Every structure is written in structure tokens, then in C-alpha cells.
Amino acid sequence: LTGRYDAGSVIPATVEAHDEEYGLTNLSFTGGVLRVPRVKALKGASVRVRIRARDVSLALQKPEGISQINILQGKISEIGSPRNEHDGSPPHDIDICVDIGVPLWVRITRWSLDQMELSEGKEVYALIKSTSIDRQSLGQQAQNMEKIG
């Protein structure tokens, strides 16, 4: 987990396949597969995917018929303490770590935490929009990049 406003997770992954029709790349990692916007890297290349905690939603059941294509099952491994706001108002958000094969940090409101009755050990589904993972969120080794031009 990194800084307050940019908190997130870094997931090591491997380029599994490119979907030329839709401009997506499948990245395999210990917990499954992420579909992200096209990565300019060769199949088999190692990449690191940065996912911001604020870009992840949680569900208690596997959702269907939604636009988010990255739906990963996991278990809550840690619930952080609410942070006090600098303006003196009560804290409204909280960071949660979900084990999806690797640690994935999620930032939700305390209201959602209470309404969903979330607790450590509870099974959840993490939802990550593919469009929230941009090229700046992907780090890769130079020798594995495709030649352009």
C-alpha cells in the first residue's frame, strides 16, 4: 500500500496473449488473468501492473451483465483503520487488503464496509475496470518490448 491518495498494489504478471480485435492484452498472474488495454510487449514478457485502490470495487456475489471484465475472487486478509480527515470531519474511507493470489488493496467507504458486513476472512469479488489500468500503470523490462516502427 502506497501513499494516501495514490494507494494501490503492484502485481507481477506475464503477457499471456493479445486480443487484436478488441485491443486488449491478457496478463496472467498468481491469482488468475487480468485483461488490460493493449500492452506493447511480447508474449511471455514480464510486466508489473499497478492498480490503484480507488479503482477497485467489491461485491459479495459474482456479478453478471456488467461492463467490468476483471472480476477476481478473493478473501479479505486485512481491514485497515479509518483515517482521520485533516479538516476534523469523521473518516469516510477505509483500505482493505483482498488476497486474490497476491495482495490487492481496495479503498471503499466505511458505509460500504458496514452495509456489506465485511470482515477478515470473508469471500468477496474484486472488480477492476480495464480502462483504469493505463500504460503508466504498467512497468516492463525493455528487452521484452515490441519494436515499433
Predicted region positions:
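Residue-level preference for beta-strand/loop junctions
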Residues: 7, 43, 68, 90-92, ...
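Internal alpha/beta loop-helix hairpins
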Residues: 1-33, 54
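Short coil/loop residues immediately preceding or within conserved phosphate-binding loops
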Residues: 10, 71, 93-95, 103
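Short, conserved beta-turn/loop elements at beta-strand boundaries and strand-helix junctions
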Residues: 17-23, 79-92
